């Protein structure tokens, strides 16, 4: 999977992909492994969109701390892999969120964070798939971009979308699907697809708000990879 992602230390690029696995087949463990490899490869910002519920987000945050970060983001005590080999503090990934706190609005005023990323310690963020939370995250990234007088955040970013089929890819129709009430004439027959099958014409659709929010996050980085995980594509 990592080989298909954007090169975090290469030229500006954007890649998108999907991983499909059966229910309870280890998808979370798979993307935690991908995150670890991505950090080794040089990714500087790692965002996990962990479902719609806070309980799911909390569970994902805990597993991330135990499997990758090595410390509890609240009290900085060693957990999981951190009990076997504790990194020096400057190499511990920085958690913007913790098991008790999603990405909140007050974080948007702190524009110092991303400018202090070291050569070896990425920033990790675990958020709910919630419009308000995603807006807060987008506003924070905008503040960092403007504070550094940049059109785009000059860092490599990996976005993991858990349960990617839920809301992330939703579209809304710009036009009503009006089926003809009378038999079509020869000229009208040519337009049948547009009238009856608007799903085949992407220009007739707009992204829903969550879909658009995820797109906004991806556009803010010069190097980004989106990987959606799902059991029901």
Q: Which positions does each model-derived feature cover?
A:
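RecA-like P-loop NTPase motor core of helicase/translocase proteins
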Residues: 1-233
